Amino acid sequence: MIIIDLEWNCGSDYSGFDEILQIGAVRIKTLGGCILDTFNIYVKPQVNTTLHPAAVKLPELWHSFADGVCFPVAFLKFREWARHEKDYIAWGEDDFRVLQQNVTYWNLPPLSIRAAFNLQRGFGHHQTAKR
């Protein structure tokens, strides 16, 4: 099971393309279990090179410009790291939408996802149920 967290820039021109700047992930066997492995890679912006004001506030953003690789390289490294995993979790539903948008834009083979879970939605339901 892979928990993924993306950071992205929607660009200052509000073009509608959310360009990924960072892919972070951890591998776990079960929810609540130990972290088995980690992945982190910075992506150099190629499309939206002018940052949206919200993207400027992202921590360690300078890594994307200084150490970042193009998205196709970053995604292929992520796929290699994720291997044949088919269960993915993200903090919010936008991560999967943005990932698919970038994969489509760069004409890359998509991840084979059997199940995609949104922790933010689950956490919200849990908090509501506790009241």
Regions found by a protein language model. Name each.
Residues 103-114:
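A short alpha->loop->secondary-structure connector
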Residues 1-97, 101-104:
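Conserved non-catalytic scaffold segment of RNase H-like nuclease domains
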Residues 116-131:
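Short alpha-helix plus adjacent loop in nuclease-associated cores
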